């Protein structure tokens, strides 16, 4: 018991002092010098993450509220569907028209090929060459084209004189060819 009384006396003998946090300063300073940048970047990252989450939450709330408002407006949905259907119908009609035009062209080409084969067969039966009759038909079309253009052909002048040689530099005007310099352009030999 006396030991306990002695401990109390010692505590009572020491006047109470205000304890400050100066004993933490060296450890905090050491921690900040070692990990200060990591701590700063971590705080900035957390701040940016919070901002991003707030934006995404607010955008989902506005989408859900606007989606519910659109769902309540049945008339606009019906009008949009009808416009979409009319657009699809119009595009399908255009495609059908193009397909019909293509089929017509194909039919005409097949008819032309069939007619040419018949003409070739008939000419072979008569003992004539099919190519000869094709050349005659081509000459007839050329004669018709030449008769429609009455312009006489003029003699063309040659572009260069007959003595021109691009390698010799003769008859060259202001520029002539010269070989390039030898060696490095910046100079300086090892």
UniProtKB/Swiss-Prot annotation:
Transmembrane segments: 30-50
Annotated region (Disordered), positions in chain: 1-20, 58-190
Pfam families, alphabetized: Selenoprotein_S
Subcellular location: Endoplasmic reticulum membrane; Cytoplasm
Keywords: Cytoplasm, Endoplasmic reticulum, Membrane, Selenocysteine, Transmembrane, Transmembrane helix
Origin: domain of life: Eukaryota
Entry annotated with the keyword Membrane: yes
Membrane topology classification: Single-pass membrane protein
A GO cellular component annotation in the UniProt record: Derlin-1-VIMP complex
Biased composition (Polar residues): 136-151
Compositionally biased intervals (Low complexity): 58-68
Xref: Gene3D superfamilies: 6.10.250.2950
InterPro entries: Selenoprotein_S (IPR009703)
Gene Ontology BP term (one): retrograde protein transport, ER to cytosol
Basic and acidic residues: compositionally biased ranges: 1-13, 79-120
Coiled-coil positions: none
Family: Belongs to the selenoprotein S family.
Function summary: Involved in the degradation process of misfolded endoplasmic reticulum (ER) luminal proteins. Participates in the transfer of misfolded proteins from the ER to the cytosol, where they are destroyed by the proteasome in a ubiquitin-dependent manner.
PANTHER family cross-referenced by the UniProt entry: SELENOPROTEIN S
Name of the protein this chain belongs to: Selenoprotein S
Annotated organism of origin: Danio rerio
């Amino acid at each position: 018991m006396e030991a306990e009384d002695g401990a109390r006396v010692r505590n009572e003998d020491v006047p109470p002092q205000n304890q400050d946090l100066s004993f933490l300063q060296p450890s905090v300073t050491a921690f900040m010098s070692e990990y200060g940048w990591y701590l700063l970047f971590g705080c900035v990252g957390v701040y940016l993450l919070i901002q991003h989450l707030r934006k995404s939450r607010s955008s989902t709330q506005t989408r859900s509220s606007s989606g519910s408002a659109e769902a309540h407006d049945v008339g606009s949905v019906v009008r949009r569907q009808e416009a979409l259907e009319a657009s699809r119908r119009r595009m399908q009609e255009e495609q059908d028209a193009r397909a019909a035009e293509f089929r017509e062209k194909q039919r005409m080409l097949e008819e032309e090929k069939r007619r040419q084969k018949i003409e070739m067969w008939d000419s072979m039966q008569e003992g004539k060459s099919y190519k000869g009759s094709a050349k005659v038909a081509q000459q007839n079309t050329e004669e018709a084209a030449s008769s429609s253009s009455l312009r006489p052909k003029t003699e063309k002048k040659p572009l260069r004189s007959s003595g021109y040689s691009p390698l010799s530099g003769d008859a060259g005007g202001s520029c002539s060819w010269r070989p390039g310099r030898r060696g490095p352009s910046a100079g300086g030999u090892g």
